[in-house]
Amino acid sequence: MGKSPADGGLWVGKSFDSRNNSLNLIRLIFALAVLVHHAWPLSGTENSPAFAGDTLGGWAVAGFFVISGYLITHSRFTHSLGDYLVHRVARIVPAFVICLIVVAGMFAPVGYVKANGSLDGFLGAATTPFNYVFSNLGLRMSVYDVAGTPAAVPYAGVWNGSLWSIYFEFCCYLIVAFIGLFALVRKSPWPLTIFFLLSVAANVFMVRVSPYAQANYEFEMLVHLLPFFLGGAVVYVWKHRIGIHWLPAILSLAAAAALTAFFPAWGGGASGAFIAYGLLWISLWLPSPRLIKKNDVSYGIYIYAFPVQQLLALYGLHEHGLTAYICIAAVLTFIPAVASWILLERPIMRAVRRTGKTPATVPAVAGPDAGVPAQAADSNVVGVTPDGSPLPAPN
């Protein structure tokens, strides 16, 4: 395909088409990959799929973060700080809170009756439904069970072991919100590139850096995930010079494979920009059904898959083999996921876009596709980071 006139300033390739791509499909694949990954521990099966130093779910996390890094940076650089934060909160929090309520009010009672024969004592148990919802409202998961359920399952005491990662996703949103305040970051790609390299260095030297945070788990997890997110951000700030082309895409994916193979401890994070560029290229030629292009249910798949899998395990479906367990869980998870998208996520985002139209005060890094409406990014943004490994233990 030839270049359009808007591609004249690019050193290589063509501008990324923010409207005609399969990023929704790719994110849906990542969400389902997390469901598949969780099938092993939730069924009590050992030796879940892993390669290059991480699990299948862990690599799905990486994919989510790099795509999110690209799209969220676009959102930040094309919106005022206030509108940006409103968009991010609207995209993440309502569906998150409703998921907490659904688990506490629908899934947990079923689990309690299954374990005790009735609902007697359910509302007064050690971890009440209200406590579960209220304790986790701030995105930081601190309570995983409801009234001691789920019980009598291979992975007991955890209704939703995926939601913990949303906290770290939102931390990345706040980091981009902060660095976007500086005019130099908007005008030149180099500051954000340097910030990405510093995040990689922190990940490489985690053993030396961690003691200064007293081996804080949240700090270590953020340091591990941030390079993936910033890798996507780096690809965004260089898009006015480096377009999408098959040759650098193949080289990027090869470099990512080499880094992760030879340096499994930190090669994935160091490959953040390579992975992001490769995924953007794939999204331009991978065919996607129109229904998926227009409807993004990957967030719903992510937040509801784990409780659906736990509910199935309560009734012994995990004992019929991994294939049946995975397929049934995937089909059933689409029900709450689609409902969440149609009834909650899409209406809220449409309402937010109608009310928030304030542009960023400082022009973003100029590029041949700088005229793409900011809403295009938000229509593709899913603040999801389906978790990888290890699964969180109940507090």
Model-predicted regions and their roles:
Residues 20-22, 49-61, 155-168, 208-228, ...:
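Interfacial loop-to-helix transition and helix-capping segments at the boundaries
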Residues 2, 7-9, 60-90, 95-120, ...:
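Juxtamembrane transmembrane-helix termini
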Residues 254-346:
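Alpha-helical transmembrane segments of multi-pass integral membrane proteins
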Residues 72-79, 105-111, 178-187, 233-242, ...:
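Structural signal for the C-terminal ends of transmembrane alpha-helices
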Residues 18-76, 93-95, 301-306:
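Functionally critical transmembrane alpha-helices in membrane proteins and complexes, commonly lining
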Residues 1-14, 77, 106, 262, ...:
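C-terminal "closing" transmembrane helix and its immediate cytosolic amphipathic cap
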Residues 170-199, 236-247, 318:
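Solvent-exposed interhelical
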Residues 97-170, 276:
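Membrane-interface helix-loop-helix regions
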